[in-house]
Amino acid sequence: MNAVLNKRPTIERLYESVRHYADGKKGIVYAISIGHARNIASYYSKHGMNAVAIDSKTPALRRKQFVEDFKQGRIQILVNVDVFSEGFDCPDIEFVQMARPTLSLAKYLQQVGRGLRKSKGKEYCMLIDNVGLYRMFGLPIANRDWQAMFEGRLAARVIPIASKQDTIVLPET
């Protein structure tokens, strides 16, 4: 999957989605690998967005400084690989970009949930879903019949929220 997603044309498409829908906004991006996260952050930064990558190899002090700078508005975009899936609280996040697939509903809801925190003056959070997870899981705020899901039946209705040109088509595995 990394070989498909971590290519310049794909990263350009990710960037164009953010530029089109969330230019100048504060957000968090979920990448599939350390290299993918670093390439996204580098590309975004080269094109005028203040972005940094944080991953398991980022030294603790540097990670802490990046998070503080993000919370204070000195960094616009955090690109990460499973670092901020849960337990990260920054209510003024304005967009979440899904640049990686997952088969886990729990992971999807946790990651998108980083942007769903209430914040003074915040009316909404944009979900930029470049990998089409909404097709599998529905909107993160959808009412869910959890019992039906546990029994193996999908209960969520799917509502498209990104245009076709913004979605990266992944090859069949």
Residue ranges and their predicted role:
Residues 148-173:
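Cys/His-rich short segments
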Residues 47-50, 91-95, 121-126:
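Short glycine-/polar-rich loops that comprise or flank the Walker A/P-loop
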Residues 28, 36-86:
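Conserved helicase ATPase core of P-loop NTP-dependent helicases/translocases
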Residues 43, 66-69, 92, 107-114, ...:
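Alpha-helical scaffold elements adjacent to nucleotide-binding pockets in ATP/GTP-utilizing enzyme cores
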Residues 78-97, 113-117:
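SF2 helicase motor core recognition
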Residues 101-110, 114-145:
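Conserved segment of the helicase C-terminal RecA-like domain
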Residues 1-33, 146-152, 158:
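Conserved interdomain linker/interface between the two RecA-like ATPase lobes of SF2 helicase motors
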Residues 8-12, 60, 64, 81, ...:
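Amphipathic alpha-helical transducer elements in NTP-driven molecular machines
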